[in-house]
């Protein structure tokens, strides 16, 4: 990684016509807010030394939560869940996505499919709690039933639709009224959705990230069966959930930069100092930061390194990679062969074992790549000023399940938990600051904030497109990977 320089979900049966987005009458901003936003966007796009950040209302106004749901999250590949949590055939799980009811169903082949969680008949929510079905999902209201055995979601049964005892009706076509599928894809153990149906193919969208990191993680970056064999996440000691009283964008912004390292993560800064970190601009849709001093051999399973990375939704980019995660190493001797050591990705170049990078997959997935593990952190916006973060650690080889690695895994999780938690006060403090009329979006350090400015410009392009000012979905915009 030069300086700035799991089985797939089913795509079958997806139809843009039935994507389910429709028109959200509350998705557009009130005229006053829209004008306020439009007036600020040009300042975001200035060269970084003269640029301004997004206005306070984008972080505090409830109207923006709905606006971003429809015009930003729904029109890009967005992280929804972890694939391994939805790999039990017949299992159905309801998921609230920023107020929209969805369901994740697992078909016979173990692959997850996403649908809108609503009956085609009278709009009753179909699934209220996780449950296992026999392949048929029955609405609790009028018992209309949908086929989940092959992930089609087809409408199979309509009791008494034509009158008592008449289960079919003239002119009614069951085939036209199945569950409404949501376009989805599994990659790196994460289940992504495209609610609009208009985003580029996932493989096209993620291609810049795959190209950058495949030389390090190998088959893990490819998806499908090869990735499932290359990666694993243990059932225990592999994840955590945190909540913070902040807007989701502040979590992303904090993750993008290492500038705060000396003050928020001082112990990490002792052995992975700020000067060892660098900006990572992958493409228009992905940016973050990296470190040159992730040292696997530091870990002893006792947590001497802080990891750091990116915290509770407010990561720090330099992440565990910063080295601290050393703890996550459990005493690795560098090649994963030592007792208790976590195996290392076999393709990772030996000359760059101390390099780690922390890109953001916009809008809501924080990634951390280290020689002996990687993590994925999904940010769930719950309200304009509240988020939940779900973190999962992944290992290669037998690192996820071998008893000899148990202490290393537990130490790694403890280190990341400590690091993520350290960032909560920072992002919550920024959220409170957004209530001040004395703050108008802030400014950027040309040396330290390039990825943060990159993210602001990405958001601004989405806003501008929603307001009718151009810039589309996916690889839209003017490309801001230069001059930041």
Stretches found by the model and what they are:
Residues 85-197, 201-208:
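Rieske [2Fe-2S] iron-sulfur-binding domain
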Residues 2-129, 183-185:
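N-terminal pre-ligand scaffold of iron-sulfur
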Residues 32-35, 57-61, 142-143, 301-302, ...:
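Short low-complexity stretches enriched in small and charged residues
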């Amino acid at each position: 990684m030069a300086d700035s320089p799991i089985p797939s979900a089913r795509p079958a049966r997806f139809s843009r016509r039935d994507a389910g987005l429709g028109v959200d009458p509350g998705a557009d901003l009130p005229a006053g807010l829209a004008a306020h936003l439009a007036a600020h966007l040009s300042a975001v796009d200035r060269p970084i030394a003269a640029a301004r950040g997004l206005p306070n209302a984008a972080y505090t106004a409830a109207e923006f939560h709905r606006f971003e749901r429809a015009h930003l999250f729904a029109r890009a590949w967005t992280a929804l869940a972890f694939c391994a949590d939805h790999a039990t055939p017949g299992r159905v799980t309801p998921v609230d996505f920023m107020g929209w009811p969805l369901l994740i169903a697992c078909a016979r082949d173990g692959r997850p499919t996403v649908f809108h969680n609503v009956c085609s008949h009278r709009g009753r929510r179909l699934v209220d709690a996780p449950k296992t079905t026999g392949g048929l999902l029955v609405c609790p209201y009028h018992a209309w039933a949908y086929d989940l055995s092959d992930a089609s979601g087809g409408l199979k049964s309509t009791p008494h639709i034509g009158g008592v005892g008449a289960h079919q009706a003239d002119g009614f076509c069951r085939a036209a009224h199945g569950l409404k599928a949501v376009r989805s894809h599994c990659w790196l153990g994460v289940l992504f959705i495209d609610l609009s149906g208009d985003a580029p193919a996932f493989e096209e969208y993620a291609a810049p990230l795959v190209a950058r990191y495949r030389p390090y993680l190998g088959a893990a970056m490819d998806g499908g069966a090869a990735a499932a064999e290359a990666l694993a996440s243990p059932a225990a000691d592999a994840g955590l959930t945190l909540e913070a009283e902040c807007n989701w964008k502040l979590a992303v912004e904090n993750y993008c930069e290492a500038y705060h390292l000396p003050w928020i993560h001082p112990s990490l800064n002792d052995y992975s100092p700020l000067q060892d970190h660098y900006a990572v601009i992958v493409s228009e849709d992905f940016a973050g930061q990296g470190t040159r001093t992730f040292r696997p051999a530091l870990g002893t399973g006792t947590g001497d390194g802080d990891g750091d990375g990116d915290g509770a939704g407010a990561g720090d980019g330099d992440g565990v990679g910063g080295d601290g995660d050393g703890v996550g190493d459990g005493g690795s001797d560098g090649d994963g062969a030592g007792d208790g050591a976590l195996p290392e990705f076999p393709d990772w170049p030996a000359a760059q074992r101390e390099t780690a990078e922390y890109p953001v997959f916009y809008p809501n997935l924080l990634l951390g790549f280290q020689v002996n593990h990687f993590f994925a952190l999904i940010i769930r916006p719950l309200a304009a000023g509240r988020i939940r973060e779900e973190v999962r650690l992944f290992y290669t080889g037998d690192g996820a399940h071998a008893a000899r690695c148990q202490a290393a895994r537990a130490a790694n999780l403890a280190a990341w938990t400590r690091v993520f938690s350290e960032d909560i006060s920072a992002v919550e403090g920024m959220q409170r600051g957004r209530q001040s009329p004395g703050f108008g979006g802030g400014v950027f350090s040309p040396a330290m904030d390039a990825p943060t400015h990159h993210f602001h410009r990405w958001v601004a392009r989405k806003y501008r497109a929603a307001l009718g000012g151009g810039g589309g979905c996916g690889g839209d915009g003017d490309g801001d990977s230069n001059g930041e």
